[in-house]
Amino acid sequence: MVKLRDISTIAVSESTHNFEVFSGLEGVSDTVANLKSENVEINVLGHNPGSLNILIDASPHFRDEKALSDCFGPQMGGVVYDSYDRMVMKNGRIENYPDTEIPTLDVTPLNVDRSLTPKQKENRNKCKKLFDHLLLEIQRGKITAGCVDDYFAFMHAAYCVLSKVYLPRFKYKHFEISSRLVTIHECNNNTKPSLFWSNRDDESHDYMTIIQMMVQVFSNAMTKYATSHLINEYHNDLDSPTSDILTKVVDELKDIDIEPATYATIVYLWLTGEDEIEDLDVLAVIFDECRSDGFVDNLLVRMLPPCEGASLTSEAIDTGLLYTRNDGYMVYTASMVEEDVNKMEYDRRYGLPLMEFRATNSLVTLRVDYTTKTNKQMKVQLMINKFPKFELMNTDIFSSQYLMLGKNIVIDMIKMTGHMLRGNVQSANLDTQRKLSNLVSSSHPWITRLVANRARDDVHIRFASHMITDLDNLTKREHPKTIFVESLKMLDHFGKSERYELLVYLSAADF
């Protein structure tokens, strides 16, 4: 879990663009008009991890244009050098950029519409200004290499949720969405997604392309949420100066908790939504304590995969609400319950969780049950009067889908850990283990439940357990990378090509 301030820059600008969608709303039109007359708005600008990585790597050479060109090429090296030069460093102080709590930047989130058509030219100058601000934060020590490594690990966890849980739905015809998204889910299979094709240097950038898309869509969604929050505060407090209201709203935004599954869900909701106001009502369910039952229903239903002809049922329970969709082969359940519920009991009743995140004292979970039986199987069971009992500790009953997920988590955990420890092995400690465990709990909660129940018969689950519970051993080894190499010897079910791929990754990783 991270704070919104850790993954984005929350700034104000002299503009009224963000208020346009709210102008016609009944009851707040006068408030919106008054705010527009103030000519000030809030923007949430998600950080591009690629840009942060470049700036961190370039930080020792900011004043050496030749060294920057040698490291990053003449074009990117020139961009970094020019950005540094604009800050006019004098006597170790940054004269032209006062260190204020709320930065003022003439920058809005990249203009990406619902069809995800990039409009790079009109935003190029704005991108440079945000680039300047990030470089400034690095110079002030507010963004460090450790922060960037943790952010990369976080974004990889969010990418895992989006690519494995949500994006596969776009290959079906249930969404009226641009064909640009149809092949994104195939990135893991080395096919070419068409998303932001013009922004890529070459075909190897599929992964970072999707990360870039996530950052842009998340920024759009959170900027609209920040605008609605500002309107509500201004509407309810007409006596306070606008500057005080701005400060209050920005401070509240900075402290919003974001988990990988939260991030991915917001991106998915914003991509598939048809009305921004309705989408904001759903976001309010995640971030605000006051919730409308109808908005909770909308959130849970939209989290379920859209299946034509599949039955949809709701169930009010003591601890919250859940929706179930049964397509005859699998049963998906989306629930919002009290945070202190017995998770294991829900897992036994509704299946293992695919993802999970907290929403203001509540727990939102998407589960899938692969144990649905066909009519023929049910008839056989009725004839012999024997019903198999689903035991969480018994991994033998898992379908091949779980073994596939087990292999995926091995690769995902290695990459998340590699991001966290890049060039900083000596700092690997229990805090690193805690961060990794939290990322996995949100993006792959089913594996942590199995580990907690000692379900380690499957080789992949044993490896994941090893990664989760024994990461502190990294601090006790002269060569921490060996813990991964030794663990790979357990993966008997991996093919030669998969084993080779992992070993190559480990050899190249800067542990």
UniProtKB/Swiss-Prot annotation:
UniProt-annotated location(s): Host cell junction, Host plasmodesma; Host cytoplasm
Entry coiled-coil feature ranges: none
Keywords, sorted A to Z: Host cell junction, Host cytoplasm, Transport, Viral movement protein
Biological process according to GO: transport of virus in host, cell to cell
Primary site of residence: host cell
Function recorded in the entry: Transports viral genome to neighboring plant cells directly through plasmosdesmata, without any budding. The movement protein allows efficient cell to cell propagation, by bypassing the host cell wall barrier.
Protein's recorded name: Movement protein
Species for this entry: Rice gall dwarf virus (RGDV)
